[in-house]
Amino acid sequence: MDRIIYEQSYAAISELYEIAKLREGSIVVIGCSTSEVVGSTIGTNSSFETAGEIFKGLYDFAKSKGIYLAIQCCEHLNRAIITERAALPFAEIVNVVPQPKAGGSLATQAYAGFEEPVALEEIKADAGLDIGFTLIGMHLKKVAVPVRLKNNKIGSATVLAARTRAKYIGGARAMYNEEQ
């Protein structure tokens, strides 16, 4: 099962990367309920081992493309973000070290696995994966656009995805760059 979780995680972020047209330096916010991944209700059966496989799949892909992960903590840490300092080198950090029952298993794995992890109260990511209905919208740039993935399951959890685009301004006579 571990290899399957790794592969599903890798496939989901890979598909999002292509659809969202992410590029080097982009940030992808990840919300994850490992309880949902293992077939339980969110918040009831956290799995540190499952989180490890998810993190490896996501991080291996992210490193290969030069993008950054921003892992959303659970509500006990007010949905703070764990990311790498290089993603936002001048951001104001907060002092917390996530734990499986205070921050979540994936955030804990990320804190241990990132090269130079930092915690932030908030972030504005370019795209996002919501694994198991964790609600990541507060950490996406405006304007969020839903993305339907073919790879929409990790274990038993439903995977929802979003990309972002620049706001359209200017009204009826304005011209827009569809690549943004």
Question: Predicted segment positions?
Answer:
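Active-site histidine-anchored catalytic micro-motif
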Residues: 38-42, 46-53, 57-79, 102
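Ligand-binding beta-strand-loop-alpha-helix segment within the catalytic cores
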Residues: 65-127, 132
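Generic secondary-structure signature for well-ordered alpha-helical cores
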Residues: 14, 18-21, 59-67, 111-119, ...
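Solvent-exposed alpha-helices and their adjacent loops that cap or buttress functional pockets
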Residues: 20-22, 102, 148-153
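Structural motif
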Residues: 28-31, 160
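Glycine-rich beta-strand-to-loop/alpha-helix junction loops that act as flexible
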Residues: 30-35, 72
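Glycine-rich, aromatic-bearing surface loops/beta-hairpins
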Residues: 108, 112-180
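N-terminal glycine-/serine-/threonine-rich phosphate-binding loop
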Residues: 1-28, 48-61
